[in-house]
Structures are given as structure tokens and as C-alpha cells.
Amino acid sequence: MENLRFLSVSLQLAARLASLGCRRFVGAGTCFEYEPSPGYLAENCSTGPSSLYAATKLGCYLALEQLSKLMGMEVTWLRFFYLFGPYEDERRLVPSVICSLLKDQEAKVTRGDQIRDFLHVEDMAAAICAVAQSHLTGVVNIGSGQPVTVRDLVSKIGEILDRQKLIKLGALPYSGSEPMSICADNSRLTQNTQWVPRYNLEHGLRHTVEWWQLHLASHPSQEWEGLPGA
């Protein structure tokens, strides 16, 4: 029930800030608040969370909207899509494939037909700063706006490391709750801020591979689980 605790704490924090005269609150949501659908997801698309995590994120935003009306504090809600980069939990897709290949182990994945929107974590941080410095309120998507299949993503990692044969597409089944397509329409972000991503997908993956090479070389026996809350 940690998600419910985070919901309560977040709303208490926002209410306290509003009572102290805070004029704007920027919160972190998730793309999983949306109802999955083919094509690009814009901020006005239907919501339909299918997990407690996503439901509490959406609930937090809806409650913040009402708090905004009551206390006069503007609310900006960032919906993050798929992120990758240094310090990510090794059990997640990009680092798990990279680490398996660096250890000369098979990287077992699904058939990889899922369409995703991946953004390097440094570009995410820059987007947060850009939105914070803008006048945007309401929901803002934080994503690359560039769809890629999981198959192409992991194949690119294999190509970078020259270990394509270790990638085993179709070795894992699809998750029943996994959306097959999720990609951001990030036009609200790009048209209303100065944000321009520094990394394209290949550049970001190469940067991430280099980080993991250094990390595994300096921590050869350590199981990395990322930063707290990652």
C-alpha cells in the first residue's frame, strides 16, 4: 500500500505549500495514467489506469486540480514516458539487456513488437527545468515523441556491443497487462518551452552502455538496484 501512502503525503505537501503562499506546484505523473491506444498520446487523451500505481498518480493530479481552485495555486503535472540512462535499476529492460550482454550472457526478451517512447534521463531532467521555467500549467507529456519497437531497441544495444547473437527474442511471453503501444505527443512541451533533446536513441544508448561498462568494471560483484525509488 506504499502507493496510497505516497498519494497522501504528496497531497499533504501540496496543501502545506499552498498555505505558505506557494504559487505553483510541479508534480510527477506517469504515461500509465492514459488509456492505452495506438498512435500518439496527447494530454487530452482519455485516462484509464490499470494499476494501483497509475491510479494513485491520476488521483493525485485530480485532487491537485481541485486544491488549485480552492487555494489559488497553479498545478503543472508532468506525465513521464519510458526513461533510460545511468543509475537505472538493473532489472529494467535497457540495463538488463546491456548487463547481460556485457557479461556474455543471453538477454531473454519478448518478441519485441511493443511500441515504446524512450527518453534519456538527462533529457528528462532538462525537460523538467524547461517546464518549471515556463508558464505551462495542467498536464505536460515528457517523452521523445519518437516511437520505437522493443525489438529495434534491444537489437540496437546488441549492435553497439557486437553481441547480437546473445539477444533471444521471443524467449519471454508478453505480460497480460502490458500495453502494446504507448508513445508521447510531446508538442505541448516542444512548442511552449526552449527544450530540445540532447540525445537521439542511438546516442543515448551508447552513453548508457559506456556508463554500465565503467560501473561493472569498478563493481564486478555488486548487484545494482538503482537509486531509491528508481
Predicted features by range, described:
Residues 34, 51, 76-93:
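Flexible, glycine-rich beta-alpha linker
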Residues 1-5:
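NAD(P)H-binding glycine-rich loop region in Rossmannoid oxidoreductase-like domains
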Residues 10-11, 15, 54, 58-65, ...:
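Conserved active-site helix of classical SDR/Rossmann-fold NAD(P)-dependent CH-OH oxidoreductases
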Residues 101-230:
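C-terminal substrate-binding subdomain of Rossmann-fold SDR/epimerase-dehydratase oxidoreductases
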Residues 11-52:
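Conserved Rossmann-fold NAD(P)-dependent oxidoreductase catalytic core, especially the SDR/UDP-sugar
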Residues 31-33, 83-85, 114, 124:
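Conserved sequence/active-site signature of Rossmann-fold short-chain dehydrogenase/reductase
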Residues 37, 48-76, 102:
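Active-site Tyr-X1-5-Lys
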